[in-house]
A protein has these predicted regions:
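Conserved active-site segment immediately N-terminal to the catalytic lysine
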Residues: 5-41, 56, 94-95
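PLP-dependent aminotransferase class I/II
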Residues: 1, 15, 52-227
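Short acidic, glycine/proline-rich loop/turn micro-motifs
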Residues: 41-42, 158
Length: 227
């Protein structure tokens, strides 16, 4: 009965063994944040599932937990004024079945996203072109950096260009990032790195300590993304 949630936030359009990412789980999420493969005027996201029960629950939670979010015609009189709460006549538009959120997409963002989606193939081709150009450029510096190696089964969307600074490099990551930024090349570290070292997670109870996750530490100390 294990349920799988797939984080496909950064990689819409990517495939593994010919199957689209997001197709390997009960529920998958995709992000439309500003620097991701496509965006909805700077923000937004999507949950996808083939399970109608999960889809309805997601719609419910998205819209304050209101049951009217599941109606095809929420304004119809026969839907609205034929319900009671504790013997009180009520409006079905304002019955809250769950404690939910206000995460409904805007029409502007949706319109922006549709245009972006229609250009997805062109966007993916451009990102792959940039990946090959950057790979060829940085090959001359392999003595000091580790370049990304693509899995043979993967067709990658290249949300960004990642690499690691080796410990023997004659420069620090901080200095390289400042150099790039001063030349209008946007950089970022690899998100949280070892999340157990982040201030907000210091007191989280988990299996193992921060020092146990050596690969996460390597990412945190030496990882760079070129956006």
């Amino acid at each position: 009965n294990l349920k799988v949630l797939e984080d496909s936030a950064d990689i819409i359009g990517a495939k593994y063994k010919g199957q689209p990412t997001g197709n390997f789980a009960d529920i998958s999420i995709t992000s439309f944040y500003g620097m991701h493969v496509i965006n909805c005027a700077g923000n937004g996201g999507m949950i996808t599932t083939s399970n109608i029960e999960y889809a309805n629950k997601a719609k419910l939670l998205r819209s304050w937990g209101r049951s009217s979010s599941l109606f095809n015609d929420a304004e119809a009189i026969e839907n609205r004024f034929n319900v009671k709460i504790d013997d009180i006549d009520y409006d079905a538009k304002f019955i809250f079945e769950k404690i939910g959120y206000n995460l409904e997409p805007s029409e502007l963002g949706s319109a922006f996203g549709i245009v972006q989606f229609n250009k997805l193939d062109k966007i993916l081709d451009h990102r792959k072109k940039v990946y090959h150009e950057l790979s060829n450029f940085f090959l001359k510096y392999e003595k000091w950096i580790d370049l990304p190696k693509k899995n043979n089964h993967a067709d990658t969307a290249w949300f960004a260009f990642p690499f690691f600074i080796k410990e023997n490099a004659p420069f620090k990551r901080r200095d390289l990032m400042i150099f790039f930024e001063n030349h209008n090349i946007q950089t970022r570290v690899v998100f949280t790195g070892n999340i157990l070292r982040q201030p907000g997670y210091k007191n989280i109870k988990c299996i193992g300590a921060a020092d146990d996750f050596v690969n996460a530490d390597r990412v945190m100390r030496g990882g760079i993304l070129l956006a």
